[in-house]
Structure formats: structure tokens, C-alpha cells
């Protein structure tokens, strides 16, 4: 009888397995923070803690999500932006204590899970269609 109870609890606790590949909502239990759900094509702003010498500050990195990797150790996501004409990509772990906050600026409509083709595009060709929000 105890085995049945354990089998019933397992699907409820494994939210990571039932999460959609394109969107992810991760709860960092160590820091007690919840990241919003986002996926490839979304424009997000990541607030990252940067330590320079003995000083510490928050740096914002806004860009398009290229990929979201979900793994047993929490996974990571890659964000790309164009800075002074040069493409800059940063990969952030979901469970990193250096990621203080993630804001979703706009939702993008894409048909791929990995948007590496954006690396070759520039200007208007690199635009992503925005998801139309239906009024509730």
C-alpha cells in the first residue's frame, strides 16, 4: 500500500518532467525565488549580480532567448543581444545565485526550439514576430 502512495506522489513532485519544452518556470529553492515562464524567441531582461574586486552590483542583460536547456541539475538558458554592432551571447544557469531576477519584456512567436539561425541574420531580418495577446 505504501508503494502506491509513493507512485502517486512522484508525478506531482516531478514538475520538471511535465514542463513544456518551450516554456519553463523554475523555482530556486536555495534562494527562494521563482523565475517567470519563458521560451525561445522571448525578449527577456536578466538582472545578474556582478562582482568586481570587492564591489558588487547588478547588471541588466536584455536580449532574445536562443535556447532553453532543462536538465536534472536545473539547466540553463542563452540570451543574445547586439551591443555596438557586435552580437553578445550569455548563458545563465537557472539555479545560479547570481541571477537575481528575470523579466519577460515581450513574447515571441517562433517555430523552433533553438534559434541559432539568428546568429547569421542582422537588422530587420533578425526580427521575431510578437505573440498577439487576446483580451480575457
Curated annotation (Swiss-Prot):
One of its GO terms (molecular function) is structural constituent of ribosome. GO terms for biological process: translation. Residues 12-23 have a biased composition (Acidic residues). Residues 1-23 are annotated as: Disordered. GO terms for cellular component: cytosolic large ribosomal subunit. Transmembrane segments: none annotated. It comes from the Bacteria. Pfam families: Ribosomal_L19. PROSITE patterns: RIBOSOMAL_L19. Keywords: Ribonucleoprotein, Ribosomal protein. HAMAP family: Ribosomal_bL19 (MF_00402). Belongs to the bacterial ribosomal protein bL19 family. This protein is located at the 30S-50S ribosomal subunit interface and may play a role in the structure and function of the aminoacyl-tRNA binding site. This is Large ribosomal subunit protein bL19.
Amino acid at each position: 500500500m505504501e508503494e502506491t502512495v509513493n507512485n502517486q506522489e512522484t508525478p506531482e513532485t516531478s514538475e520538471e518532467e511535465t514542463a513544456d519544452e518551450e516554456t519553463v518556470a523554475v523555482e530556486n529553492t536555495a534562494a527562494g525565488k521563482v523565475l517567470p515562464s519563458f521560451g525561445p524567441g522571448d525578449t527577456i531582461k536578466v538582472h545578474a549580480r556582478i562582482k568586481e574586486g570587492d564591489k558588487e552590483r547588478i547588471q541588466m542583460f536584455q536580449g532574445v532567448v536562443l535556447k532553453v536547456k532543462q536538465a536534472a541539475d536545473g539547466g540553463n538558458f542563452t540570451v543574445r543581444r547586439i551591443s555596438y554592432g557586435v552580437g553578445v551571447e550569455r548563458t545563465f544557469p537557472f539555479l545560479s545565485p547570481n541571477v537575481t531576477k528575470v523579466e519577460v519584456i515581450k513574447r515571441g512567436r517562433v517555430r523552433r526550439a533553438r534559434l541559432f539561425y539568428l546568429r547569421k541574420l542582422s537588422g530587420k531580418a533578425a526580427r521575431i514576430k510578437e505573440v498577439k495577446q487576446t483580451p480575457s
